[in-house]
Amino acid sequence: MGESKISASMMCADLINLKDTIKIFEDKGVEYLHIDVMDGEFVPNFGLGVDYIRGLRALTKIPLDLHLMIKDPEYKLQWIGIKETDIVSIHYESTYQVQRALDWLAPFGTGLY
């Protein structure tokens, strides 16, 4: 079994003090920021979206752990701006085109779970 990694969930992060929170995470050695991306279609909730992800990337170099709870992720992945250091989780039941989503992610070398 591999080495454990720390991935801090951003779902309940204080948006007003986000910059300070990110600084604490960086100082404490958090290795990933976990982002629950929800579209209100695959799951009934809405979660953190593309603009939030872009904002986080502007604040830190910490890679993202993207949990995609979205319908048909293979058509939406390009909006997210995935990087080689990110981890991406998709639900197999969120699409009829799982292989297309995997093929789209392959060039990024992302960890896929």
Name these PLM-found stretches:
Residues 1-87, 93-97, 104-110:
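Conserved N-terminal beta1-alpha1 strand-loop-helix module at the mouth
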